[in-house]
Amino acid sequence: MTPRYELAAPAERDLEDIFFEVKERHGLLVAERVYDNLLRTFDLLAQMPEMGRHRPELWPPPYRFWGTGPAFIAYRADVRPIRIVRIARASHNWSGFAPRG
């Protein structure tokens, strides 16, 4: 079976960082909930890749963005499987993130 989405290496690190940051601040159960919510959101984006918005003020197309809870997901919907390139807290300054992937 072909995967529905893939995580770029920076997104894998982001996901891990978010998990451990939430665990440290709010405990394991909350961290697991946030992690599971992100994985469900990746699946949803794979089912409806056009759901996210282009945000040219952040990154040029083909990158799209989708917010879920405290996180903001940058991904490419123009490739299959879709490619999750970065994940950050919604309040994060995206200008420091270079779109790789």
Residue ranges and their predicted role:
Residues 1-59:
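Basic, Lys/Arg-enriched alpha-helical interface segments
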Residues 9, 67-68:
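Conserved strand-loop elements at the edges of beta-sheets that form or border functional pockets
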Residues 60-64:
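Short, P/G- and charge-enriched loop/turn segments at secondary-structure junctions
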